[in-house]
A protein has these predicted regions:
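Phosphate-ester processing/binding pockets and catalytic centers
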Residues: 1-274
């Protein structure tokens, strides 16, 4: 989740600025280079308290946009840029952020759950299952606030009045309309599938949480289970090889361009955002 803060700084703030200046940040993996660079420099920075303040102020600004929260974030950005322990490379990457303030109204039009991982992981999972089975599965959610807040948007992507179209870059190619059947909220205690998913999620969280106590041996046992040997759908820092490969990939159809081009065919409340 900490990496995702930096990915969202790039996606929400920097990408918006570049978009208004006619530059596609996703071409050539420029977004990944910046997000991974910011994250790497941040975890190596010696002033942990200042870095934590920077991260927390960004999350606070996105969750509850206000004059005060915006000022706090950009003020902390400058504090971190000019901190005595900030390396030159980190300074240069952080310097992409201050100019974004002139586009802040456009950047912060998202719902408060925008930076939550539930929806992007769900979307990628749906695409992966459809790629394997060619079946548009019905999905049940428990009482998930991010899902409840975004169900209208996801249904609108599912019901797009366009032919099935492949968009995206390299291994990240996916299709629209969103290949999913019915999506409903259910009570977890009444659905065995949801209970089973919770067990797997808890086990995976336990296995991946760093620790050095007596429970490490149980982590190793859980990690060795066959079901956890093929986890492809994660949001995490990229390897150098992945970024280098991604830099060479091109998209015949850019996902955002496609959605914007067909926005009139997405039946969604005008107050919602693509």
């Amino acid at each position: 989740k900490r990496y995702c803060i930096y990915a969202n700084i790039v996606n929400i703030l920097v990408e918006t600025m570049y978009h208004f200046n006619g530059i596609n940040l996703y071409e050539g993996a420029k977004n990944l280079i910046l997000a991974n660079g910011l994250h790497c420099f941040a975890i190596l920075h010696s002033n942990k308290d200042l870095v934590a303040e920077f991260e927390n102020n960004f999350v606070g600004m996105v969750r509850k946009p206000s004059i005060e929260s915006v000022a706090n974030f950009y003020r902390t950005t400058d504090k971190l840029r000019y901190d005595v322990d900030t390396r030159e490379g980190f300074f240069d990457m952080l310097s992409e952020i201050p100019p974004t303030i002139q586009y802040i109204k456009e950047a912060l039009t998202h719902k408060k759950f925008y930076i939550d991982l539930t929806i992007p992981l769900f979307s990628v999972s749906i695409q992966e299952w459809y790629n394997k089975t060619k079946v548009k599965e019905n999905v049940l959610f428990d009482s998930s606030e991010p899902f409840f807040a975004n169900i209208e948007f996801m249904e609108s992507l599912r019901d797009m009045e366009v032919p099935e179209t492949v968009v995206g870059y390299g291994k990240g190619k996916h299709v629209y309309p969103l290949p999913v059947g019915n999506m409903e909220i259910a009570k977890s205690h009444e659905e065995f599938g949801i209970q089973l998913a919770d067990v797997f999620a808890s086990a995976l969280c336990f296995a991946l949480t760093p620790r050095n106590d007596k429970f490490v041996k149980y982590q190793d046992k859980i990690k060795s289970l066959p079901i956890f040997q093929n986890i492809k759908l994660n949001i995490a820092p990229s390897t150098n090889d992945f970024i280098e490969a991604r830099m060479k990939e091109t998209a015949e159809i850019d996902p955002l361009d496609f959605l914007c081009e067909h926005s009139d065919r997405i039946n969604i409340n005008k107050k919602s955002n693509i």
